[in-house]
Amino acid sequence: MDSSRTIGLYFDSAHSSSNLLAFPIVLQDTGDGKKQIAPQYRIQRLDSWTDSKEDSVFITTYGFIFQVGNEEATVGMINDNPKRELLSAAMLCLGSVPNTGDLVELARACLTMVVTCKKSATNTERMVFSVVQAPQVLQSCRVVANKYSSVNAVKHVKAPEKIPGSGTLEYKVNFVSLTVVPKKDVYKIPTAVLKVSGSSLYNLALNVTINVEVDSRSPLVKSLSKSDSGYYANLFLHIGLMTTVDRRGKKVTFDKLEKKIRSLDLSVGLSDVLGPSVLVKARGARTKLLAPFFSSSGTACYPIANASPQVAKILWSQTACLRSVKIIIQAGTQRTVAVTADHEVTSTKLEKGHTLAKYNPFKK
């Protein structure tokens, strides 16, 4: 491959779609001399990305896993309230509901859910959340309708190593994140599509850099890079494929590839749809090879936890905003990636103000 080249990038970091803002931490009295973190909600609207008459509200909850009672105890007072021990913060995505009601009431309904959880295992350690009780307004959410959700423990629990394999575990919602998006805009690329490779293909990757607002004394900085302006994280996402030869069998030049990429008119944003996520919007025409990577309206959602669980969990508790985006053209197989140079194209727009909010209490 040719050596890398860089093309100027336009972005406006002031727009709400480039940022996810933090929940302020508010403590409230419990009445028994103790304090607890006040439940809160946040609403982000991405309905300006696509003209649509039907919007959905995606619901992501953040809360804490408690162990209820002491399984080793053999005696005790019958009227005693069982002891609740805080084990870890966690995230549970409920799914979506039509945007037809009061969003604040929707958030309040999430706080009344009764959810238990337990560990399981397949090829990965799993956390199985069981919905015991949920208000009627949430019944159309996928997780509530199914009564359970089995998720990768590393991606959805802050400290899965603290969760025991036995005992009664309860998940208590404390923060509710509501994202309003056009119904057809949320498209998660099938894993099979992401694994396609071939010597006659180029891989298109998105190198996303995210600024993270974090105190220099925080242990989180050990997982972040540092610049003069603060701390940041890097993500690498597979966003498409392009052929190395044209219809006449001739090798496609990088100039032609760059022209095709620019014609996609890509924009990138941060949101909380399936947990902290990078959203990609292609407003231009897409080739047959690129079509499976986007919805019919040209959007794609990349949960950050799939690329880097560690970065995703940092974004549970810290404000973040897009810093830069580059499109990297790589060879179509991992073997050739190892022995060829990459090619950079930085013509992607950063949606203004796409910010991720911090949830400060989520610490190990």
UniProtKB/Swiss-Prot annotation:
InterPro entries given in the database record: Matrix_C, Matrix_N, Matrix_Paramyxo_C, Matrix_Paramyxo_N
Family: Belongs to the morbillivirus/respirovirus/rubulavirus M protein family.
Main location: virion
Protein role: The M protein has a crucial role in virus assembly and interacts with the RNP complex as well as with the viral membrane.
GO BP terms in the entry: viral budding via host ESCRT complex
Keywords: Host-virus interaction, Viral budding, Viral budding via the host ESCRT complexes, Viral envelope protein, Viral matrix protein, Viral release from host cell, Virion
Molecular function GO terms recorded: structural constituent of virion
Signal peptide interval: none
Protein name per Swiss-Prot or TrEMBL: Matrix protein
Domain remark from Swiss-Prot or TrEMBL: Late-budding domains (L domains) are short sequence motifs essential for viral particle budding. They recruit proteins of the host ESCRT machinery (Endosomal Sorting Complex Required for Transport) or ESCRT-associated proteins. The matrix protein contains one L domain: a FPIV motif.
Organism: Newcastle disease virus (strain Beaudette C/45) (NDV)
Short motif (FPIV motif): ranges: 23-26
Location(s), subcellular: Virion
